[in-house]
């Protein structure tokens, strides 16, 4: 078995991983319920609020699944059978892909929503929610097929010592793939991620141009002695730009760590760092929404105020 199976002996790694998962679950829960209450309180809910709620729910489920997997990595209470291994690892892979798609499609929807009336994107404003929903369903089916290899590649960890198996948890291991199959799978993953990140880059480029235009307008307003307070569009643009920048930086770091893990033959340290990096966006991104949108802060202040009064 690979060196990564020594993870369960390191208490520091266990504390760091469970802390990340706990913080991420808490943050996504706060964001999800704040958005859900906003959606239920509006006569005509905004599509952007619906997709933010969906993204937070997807990330919440991803982190819960990772928490269950982490339990078997660090403190197994009993050996999982093959069905449990395959189901949880498959669900985790599927949710990671859906979180990536939801992030990208939210970026695109936000760009279309914030586009000016003179923009070429205006004609998509009323149709975009339906198109985004259709695109997400397409990606869902696509990821189900992409992740299906897990159902035949994940096995119960054998008792014998072997370097052929890649460690996943104390109970689960990954069978080695043939070179042709691994190349085909890697190519499909690369095409998927390149497409989604390119789409995010294009929409982010448009957002930069939009933010620059708003800045010019703000300078003009200041020169005419009118209020220079940032508009909701400017705040939304800055939020999505911050999220995109955060996603790209963390994605690049994750890829570097993943390649290092393969190079150093599944070293436990690189395996652990890769897990942390691959879930860092799901943990950090809710705080960007929470800190930049005042209504979420006010919502939870009112909730805690009622609890204290009781």
Swiss-Prot record:
Cytoplasmic side: 34-50, 115-135, 212-238, 291-310
GO molecular function terms listed in the Swiss-Prot or TrEMBL record: pheromone receptor activity
Predominant cellular place of this UniProt entry's protein: membrane
Expression across tissues: Expressed in a subset of sensory neurons located in the apical layer of the vomeronasal organ.
Topology relative to the membrane: Multi-pass membrane protein
Keyword Cell membrane: yes
Disruption phenotype: Mice show a disrupted pattern of axonal projections to the accessory olfactory bulb. Mice lacking all but one V1ra and V1rb gene (12% of the V1r repertoire) show a lack of chemosensory response to a subset of known pheromonal ligands and changes in maternal aggression as well as male reproductive behavior.
Cystine pairings recorded for this chain: 85-172
InterPro entries in the record: GPCR_Rhodpsn_7TM (IPR017452), Vmron_rcpt_1 (IPR004072)
Any one of the GO CC terms: plasma membrane
One of the GO BP terms on file: response to pheromone
Sequence intervals crossing the membrane: 13-33, 51-71, 94-114, 136-156, 191-211, 239-259, 270-290
Topology Extracellular: residue spans: 1-12, 72-93, 157-190, 260-269
Family: Belongs to the G-protein coupled receptor 1 family.
Record protein name field: Vomeronasal type-1 receptor 49
Source species of the chain: Mus musculus (Mouse)
Organism lineage: Eukaryota, Metazoa, Chordata, Craniata, Vertebrata
Gene name of this polypeptide: Vmn1r49
């Amino acid at each position: 078995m690979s060196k990564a199976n020594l993870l369960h002996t390191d208490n520091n790694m266990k504390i760091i991983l469970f802390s990340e998962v706990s913080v991420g679950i808490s943050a996504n829960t706060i964001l999800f319920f704040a958005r859900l209450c906003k959606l239920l309180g509006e006569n005509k809910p905004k599509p952007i609020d619906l997709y933010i709620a969906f993204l937070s729910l997807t990330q919440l489920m991803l982190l819960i699944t990772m928490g269950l997997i982490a339990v078997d990595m660090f403190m197994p209470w009993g050996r999982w059978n093959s069905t449990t291994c395959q189901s949880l690892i498959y669900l985790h892979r599927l949710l990671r892909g859906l979180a990536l798609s939801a992030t990208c499609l939210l970026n695109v929807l936000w760009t279309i929503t914030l586009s000016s009336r003179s923009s070429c994107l205006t004609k998509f404003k009323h149709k975009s929610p339906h198109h985004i929903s259709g695109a997400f369903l397409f990606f869902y089916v696509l990821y189900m097929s992409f992740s299906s290899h897990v159902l035949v590649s994940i096995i119960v960890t054998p008792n014998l010592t072997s370097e052929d198996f890649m460690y996943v948890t104390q109970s689960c291991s990954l069978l080695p793939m043939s070179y042709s199959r691994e190349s085909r799978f890697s190519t499909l993953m690369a095409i998927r991620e390149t497409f989604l990140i390119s789409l995010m880059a294009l929409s982010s480029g448009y957002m930069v141009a939009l933010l620059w235009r708003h800045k010019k307008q703000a300078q003009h307003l200041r020169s005419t002695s009118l209020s220079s307070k940032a508009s909701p569009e400017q705040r939304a643009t800055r939020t999505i730009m911050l999220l995109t920048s955060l996603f790209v930086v963390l994605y690049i770091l994750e890829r570097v760590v993943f390649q290092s893990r393969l190079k150093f033959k599944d070293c436990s340290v690189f395996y652990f760092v890769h897990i942390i990096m691959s879930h860092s966006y799901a943990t950090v991104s809710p705080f960007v929404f929470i800190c930049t949108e005042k209504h979420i802060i006010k919502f939870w202040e009112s909730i805690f105020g009622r609890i204290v009064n009781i």
